[in-house]
């Protein structure tokens, strides 16, 4: 059961989030944030001694801020959030809020394993500047994470969150796909505005769009590898790791899809598939950070137990970008 401190934090977070005037949901008003657009999931830079390098974080954000992104995602999978302390997670959100352009949205990953911890983290992230909370599925006890359990979890979080909630399904990391029936039920909640689906099943994305079409609910593709297909099926944007290095190109793909230039979109999408796979399922965060170094950003090391790429892996990573004309 949530204690008095949490309830107090909820009220404080609600007051602060409303005062920032970003058009988010407020109890009784029915207002929601429009999350359509492209978001890079920001990496967390570390020093050689594994401390968070906030200076490099701000440098990366200043460079990324030159592209027409809708906003930024922090403390998602690419932010290595499972390896950060609670205070580090909040400090990262705060620093990003201060460094990013004021007209961009900040989606902060606030998911934890328990419902109570998720509520507390969500409220705290609202207080340090998040516009919306992106909440990953709890998964440690995934054998018991039925649709009913997940609906209960997300409903409680959304009820108590002072900012809108975005559902986050990433089965490659959690071993758990948020069931479509649960998504449909949750889409009816006035404080759940959308979903990031990283599973890669575009038929599932199309089905979710179809079944939630009567709700004020938006779907974001979780990867640049299936961004065009997702747009064709009704998604409104994407959270794309590849946008950390090919921001202009991912935004161009968005523009081509949104203006119906499908032939040109197809050509560009083809050239993004291999690089995207390299920085996601093939080489993961170590691969993304390495290519960021090559593109003039600060990638740097990951926190243990993640390891840097081997020389052979680096060469394969380079080939995936050079063969498609990006290096």
UniProtKB/Swiss-Prot annotation:
<keyword id="KW-0456">Lyase</keyword>
<comment type="similarity">
    <text>Belongs to the DapA family.</text>
</comment>
<comment type="function">
    <text>Catalyzes the final step in the metabolic pathway of hydroxyproline.</text>
</comment>
<dbReference type="InterPro" id="IPR020625">
    <property type="entry name" value="Schiff_base-form_aldolases_AS"/>
</dbReference>
<feature type="site" description="Involved in proton transfer during cleavage">
    <location>
        <position position="168"/>
    </location>
</feature>
<dbReference type="GO" id="GO:0008700">
    <property type="term" value="F:(R,S)-4-hydroxy-2-oxoglutarate aldolase activity"/>
</dbReference>
<protein>
    <recommendedName>
        <fullName>4-hydroxy-2-oxoglutarate aldolase, mitochondrial</fullName>
        <ecNumber>4.1.3.16</ecNumber>
    </recommendedName>
</protein>
<dbReference type="GO" id="GO:0042866">
    <property type="term" value="P:pyruvate biosynthetic process"/>
</dbReference>
<dbReference type="GO" id="GO:0033609">
    <property type="term" value="P:oxalate metabolic process"/>
</dbReference>
<dbReference type="GO" id="GO:0009436">
    <property type="term" value="P:glyoxylate catabolic process"/>
</dbReference>
<dbReference type="GO" id="GO:0042803">
    <property type="term" value="F:protein homodimerization activity"/>
</dbReference>
<dbReference type="GO" id="GO:0046487">
    <property type="term" value="P:glyoxylate metabolic process"/>
</dbReference>
<feature type="binding site">
    <location>
        <position position="222"/>
    </location>
    <ligand>
        <name>substrate</name>
    </ligand>
</feature>
<dbReference type="Pfam" id="PF00701">
    <property type="entry name" value="DHDPS"/>
</dbReference>
<keyword id="KW-0496">Mitochondrion</keyword>
<keyword id="KW-0225">Disease variant</keyword>
<dbReference type="GO" id="GO:0005759">
    <property type="term" value="C:mitochondrial matrix"/>
</dbReference>
<keyword id="KW-0704">Schiff base</keyword>
<keyword id="KW-0809">Transit peptide</keyword>
<comment type="subunit">
    <text>Homotetramer.</text>
</comment>
<feature type="binding site">
    <location>
        <position position="198"/>
    </location>
    <ligand>
        <name>substrate</name>
    </ligand>
</feature>
<dbReference type="InterPro" id="IPR002220">
    <property type="entry name" value="DapA-like"/>
</dbReference>
<feature type="transit peptide" description="Mitochondrion">
    <location>
        <begin position="1"/>
        <end position="25"/>
    </location>
</feature>
<dbReference type="GO" id="GO:0106009">
    <property type="term" value="F:(4S)-4-hydroxy-2-oxoglutarate aldolase activity"/>
</dbReference>
<dbReference type="GO" id="GO:0019470">
    <property type="term" value="P:4-hydroxyproline catabolic process"/>
</dbReference>
<feature type="binding site">
    <location>
        <begin position="77"/>
        <end position="78"/>
    </location>
    <ligand>
        <name>substrate</name>
    </ligand>
</feature>
<dbReference type="GO" id="GO:0005739">
    <property type="term" value="C:mitochondrion"/>
</dbReference>
<feature type="active site" description="Schiff-base intermediate with substrate">
    <location>
        <position position="196"/>
    </location>
</feature>
<dbReference type="InterPro" id="IPR013785">
    <property type="entry name" value="Aldolase_TIM"/>
</dbReference>
């Amino acid at each position: 059961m949530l204690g008095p401190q949490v309830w107090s934090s909820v009220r404080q977070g609600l007051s602060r989030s409303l005062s920032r005037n970003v058009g988010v949901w407020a109890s009784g008003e029915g207002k929601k944030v429009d999350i359509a657009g492209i978001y890079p999931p920001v990496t967390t830079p570390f020093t050689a001694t594994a401390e968070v390098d906030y200076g490099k974080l701000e440098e990366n954000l200043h460079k990324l801020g030159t592209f027409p992104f809708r906003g930024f995602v922090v403390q998602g999978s690419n932010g290595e959030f499972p390896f950060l302390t609670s205070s580090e997670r909040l400090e990262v959100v705060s620093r990003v809020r201060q460094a990013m352009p004021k007209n961009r949205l900040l989606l902060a990953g606030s998911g934890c394993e328990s419902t109570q911890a998720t509520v507390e983290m969500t409220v705290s992230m609202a207080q340090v500047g998040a516009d919306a909370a992106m909440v990953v599925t709890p998964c440690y006890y995934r054998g018991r994470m039925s649709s009913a359990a997940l609906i209960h979890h997300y409903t409680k979080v959304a009820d108590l969150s002072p900012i809108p909630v975005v559902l986050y399904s990433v089965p490659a990391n959690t071993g758990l796909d948020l069931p479509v029936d649960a998504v449909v039920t949750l889409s009816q909640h006035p404080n759940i505005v959308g979903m990031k689906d990283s599973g890669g099943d575009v038929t599932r994305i199309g089905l979710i769009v179809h079944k939630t079409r009567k709700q004020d609910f938006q779907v974001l593709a979780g990867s640049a590898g299936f961004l065009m297909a997702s747009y064709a099926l009704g998604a409104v944007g994407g959270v794309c790791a590849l946008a950390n290095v090919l921001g202009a190109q991912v935004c161009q793909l968005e523009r081509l899809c949104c203006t119906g230039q499908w032939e040109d979109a197809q050509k560009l999408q083809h050239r993004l598939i291999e690089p995207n796979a390299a920085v996601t399922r093939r080489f993961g965060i170590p691969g993304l950070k390495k290519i960021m170094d090559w593109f003039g950003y600060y990638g740097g090391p990951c926190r243990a137990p993640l390891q840097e790429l081997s020389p052979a892996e680096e060469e394969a990573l380079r080939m995936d970008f050079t063969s498609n004309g990006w290096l």
